[in-house]
Amino acid sequence: MHALWSRGAIFSSTSIKRYNSRMRFPRLLLLIVLASPAWAGVVENVREALASNSFTAADIYLKSYRDKNGVTPEYIEAYSWMARTALNDRDYDQAQAYAKQTESLALEQIKQHPLDSEPHLAIGLGAAIEVESQTLAAKGQHEQAIAVLRTALHAYGDTSIRARLQKNLNLLSFDGKPAPALHADQFLGSKPPALAQLKGTPVLLFFWAHWCGDCKAEAPIITKLRTEYASKGLTVVGPTRLYGYTAQVENAAPADELAYIDAVRKRFYGGLLDMPVPISKYNFDTYGASTTPTLVLLDRAGKVAMYHPGALPYDELKAEIEKVVAR
């Protein structure tokens, strides 16, 4: 397919027609876009344009920023949103093209400095690999998608994007697999039992973070369902991890953050205070819990019956639990 290039963007000729037809810009809006100062944040500008269904405006922001600043980690993260949005629009060929270009730009940056030296760079590369794998899966190329993620995990398994890569691999391959053991050397609440000891009962793993508003909103739902299915043996375990900061302290010592997590737990998770809370980054990496909450339901054989990054409403989570307890 013939492709048209603008500075920092790839469009097929048919995609340009389709995307431009979504929103026709008056001249005044184009002038406003071009006049936007770099300090406004190219990531924010691109996301806002894409939220308004305008790839055209997003491309203008990217071109303007790149003309002034060149390719930077922030530019790469902003560009990754083109891939993410095309994927969301189910334009898989375009999403794949954006993802590959994002990855190519990121790899050039990595030659100059480590991936985790700049958060924008890690976010952009992680998003690119995520989109590439999800696009392949959506096109029915399941094994190729898994291969992309396994290759990426081999290359970046010791970086900040490890959990994100594992999440995407788990989405494609976790169902029906034995649940990995949890590390529980450090914990809050009651002592976490080994998952192997819980075979014979359904288990819900509720991965949460002290800063996570969606986790706090999910807690009453889980509390209610735990009560409703207590007679069926439903056990809830709530893994969390240290992030190196609290709401008050940017660089918190581990002991201080642990105390803060306990305070958050007591304030917002009152119905789950007896829930075992193993604290380990390893658990988050292994289960791919880069999204919080992440909900993982295990059947009575200790195998993964549901893997869901993100919150679930009461009715949907109840339906999943019902499937497991009915077996």
Where are these regions (language model features)?
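Flexible helix-coil transition and linker loops at the boundaries of alpha-helical arrays
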Residues: 66-75, 105-122
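N-proximal helix/coil linker or "cap" segments that precede and/or mark the start of modular domains
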Residues: 142-185, 196-199
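Structural microenvironment flanking redox-active thiols in thiol-disulfide oxidoreductases
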Residues: 217-268, 276-285
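Thiol/disulfide oxidoreductase modules built on the thioredoxin-like
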Residues: 267-322
